[in-house]
């Protein structure tokens, strides 16, 4: 079996880190939080309430792509969480990688805002949600992208994601 990278994607506050870590635990996979791969300047910019632009995101997306490549070349399974909001970002992550799958965590703005208000100590302010929703290019009809609703418990979301991933190992 070849390595496989699973990218858990969506806007801020949709539960990427929580769901991604649980998927990784369930699949006995490596977990990488994409927030940890941001250059310090990006985190400072977002913490100040300023959205990132494509120039800001470029080195971060390279790090995500390289992490996926490392996982695949080691014949491991890994879960990486990152927003991957635009198709061109997802294509950049796919570049040079043979086995990348995306889990798109999809939910209403009101549900995401509710969850953002409940979390503590995250650099991303809830005011950034509108910017991310405007930037989001929904991954409809893209290969190896599976949309999972975030309406429901963490366990039900993880179960839905794992079910679709296990059923599509060689896609």
Which residue ranges define each predicted feature?
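P-loop (Walker A) phosphate-binding loop of NTP-binding proteins
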Residues: 11
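Conserved lysine of the Walker
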Residues: 16
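Conserved substrate/cofactor phosphate-moiety recognition/catalytic segment
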Residues: 21-65
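Loop/turn-to-beta-strand initiation segments
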Residues: 74-78, 101
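Conserved phosphate-donor/acceptor-positioning beta-strand/loop module used by diverse small-molecule
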Residues: 96-116
């Amino acid at each position: 079996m070849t390595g496989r990278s699973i990218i858990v994607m969506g806007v801020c506050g949709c539960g990427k880190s929580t769901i991604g870590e649980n998927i990784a635990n369930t699949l006995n996979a490596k977990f990488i939080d994409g927030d940890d791969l941001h250059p310090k300047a990006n985190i400072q910019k977002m913490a100040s309430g300023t959205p990132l632009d494509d120039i800001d995101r470029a080195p971060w997306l390279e790090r995500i792509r390289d992490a996926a490549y490392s996982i695949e070349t080691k014949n491991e399974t890994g879960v990486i969480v990152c927003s991957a909001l635009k198709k061109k970002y997802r294509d950049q992550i796919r570049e040079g990688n043979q086995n990348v799958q995306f889990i798109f965590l999809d939910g209403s703005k009101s549900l995401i805002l509710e969850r953002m208000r409940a979390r503590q100590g995250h650099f991303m302010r809830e005011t950034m949600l509108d910017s991310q929703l405007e930037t989001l290019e929904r991954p409809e009809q893209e290969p190896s992208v599976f949309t999972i609703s975030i309406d429901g418990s963490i366990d039900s979301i993880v179960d839905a994601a794992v079910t679709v991933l296990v059923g599509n190992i060689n896609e």
